[in-house]
Amino acid sequence: LMEDGVLIAPAPYSNPAAYYFPTFKRMSSLEVLKGAPLLRYGPQTTGGVINLISTPIPDEQKGYVEAVTNERGSTDVHATYGDTNGDWGYLFETVQRSAQGFKDIDRSNRNSGFDISDYVGKLRWQGDRQSVTAKLQYSEETSNSTYVGLTDADFNQDPNRRYGLSSPDQMDNTHSGVSLTHQFEWSDNVSSTTTLYRNDFKRNWYKLSGAGNIIDQANAGDANAQGILDGTVDTSGLNYKNNAREYVSQGVQTNFDVNIGNHEFDFGARAHEDEMDRFQPVDVYDQVNGSLVFQNSVAPTGSNNRFETGEALSFWALDKWQATDKLSINLALRYEDVQTSRTQYADPGRTTIDSTRANDSAELLPGASFTYDLTQSWQVLGGVHRGFSPLGGGARANEEPETSKNWEAGVRYFGNAFFAEVIGFYSDFSNKAENCSVGSPCSNGATSGSFITGEAEIAGAEFQLQTGTRAGDFYLPVSLTYTFTQAEISKDNAASGLKKGEQLKDVPENQMSFRTGMEHPSGWDNYLVATYVDEMCVSAGCNNTATKLDETESLFLVDFISRYALTASADVFLKVDNLFDEQQ
């Protein structure tokens, strides 16, 4: 995941499971790269690359305001203003989001919503053959979110209920980013782009630990456990952990674009380092007469008090070769040299080391792909590249990173008002790995580090169709995407305990999205979007277990949006998410 070509995850090498996603409202477009060309980027080079393009500095004085509210009292405001005057251009941007949430917390006056503030400033100097762009970003978020769920009986009675035990749960985070980009045209055929960047992310999710055990007991018929959840039974020793972590991600990257004849070359390098500082004290509460009473705090040691680092040096070389008028060939080569480490401390003052880990890996990642125009309407494509994903700071010295060989082949049709594409894909993993987090535990139950599942195969096909027709004054666009995927262990693994044929986690077999609409020259446009996601394993091997809790249920959602242009510069819209009120 990148923003404007810069790694935006909190710590992509030392802590790849860490989650952060920029405010999407301030993005102007989205780039998705797959196949051999994605080796221009990294570290993950298996499934694809997402590059978020932020709002550009306008060429002239321009402003924009969008204000949205909904039935629950949530508000979203997005505003930008910028200008270019002579050699100088600038942009100011902000997003302000506030929501009350939709869950009701027992015995609490706290809502289950969030507040988000995001600010961006850009300044650019443009010379005859070069430019310098500075970008500053700062955001903060407070979310009254929890991982605590409900018993089956309570969910069936009221899925929007939250137990009072989860009332203190709250996520607080801040993110700041700075980058300086220099672009230079050395000649008509050679240019370079160099970026210095740094991102800081601080978060503390204060939340109840161990609630899942109480819910499991209540599901098994334990009336005392149900009473604890309802607040009618007193209990002691409830642990509320400060899941506090600080991340730093920084580096410098440069890329040269060189055009020679029918070849477009990319040569580049990146020096990157990131870190995670985890310091997680625990507050102990008792529940007395339905209220939480503070008892004491426990200083962090071991896994709650650790420091992880990642250092990486990357090189890449790509050649986009227009071999003939009909044949285009992409050749790519990437090199990743990664060093990670973890240090756990036995005392809060970090004077005594409890344990250490370190891992070094160096991978050469080649790739090649092509497209060939059979006719003006028909095109075939194919490619193969080597995939790579680092394990993170929790990797031991003898553990190998995830690597794979990835093939794709397909055909495209371009018509006057019709586009269709079918692409088959196959990935052969010599060492499939899962990155563990509390939000997405690994198949062995771990909530940090990595879990090696062993050899695996992922195969499937993607289908895409776009067309449209006219009905009087209306234009009716239609688009359909469908993906079929099979993902399973390909060889028994004694270390992980997984067997050949067991399904991988988090990979639905069927996914589909259908979009249609009615567009009118008056500016009144209406769209309907239907999305389907199949059930999928929450831990590897769910196809060989008997419990329904080992996999999700399938989900089908329909959204509707209607937009009307009041003037050339102002419009209004109505959007209904989840039109049929599906909830699972």
Give the ranges of each region predicted by the language model.
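Transmembrane beta-barrel wall of Gram-negative outer-membrane proteins
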Residues: 62, 69-98, 107-146, 170-187, ...
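Membrane-embedded beta-barrel scaffold of Gram-negative outer-membrane proteins
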Residues: 181-185, 189-209, 373, 379-383, ...
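Gram-negative outer-membrane beta-barrel transporters
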Residues: 324-325, 329, 426, 449-541
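Transmembrane beta-strands of outer-membrane beta-barrel pores
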Residues: 67-71, 85, 96-100, 127-129, ...
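Short acidic/polar hinge/loop motifs at secondary-structure boundaries
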Residues: 6-34
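Face-selective signature of the C-terminal outer-membrane beta-barrel domain
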Residues: 126, 131-137, 172-345, 371-373
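C-terminal beta-signal and adjacent terminal beta-strands/loops
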Residues: 430-431, 475, 532-541, 560-584
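Structural signature of Gram-negative outer-membrane beta-barrels, strongest in the C-terminal barrel
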Residues: 247, 262-264, 270-274, 303-428, ...
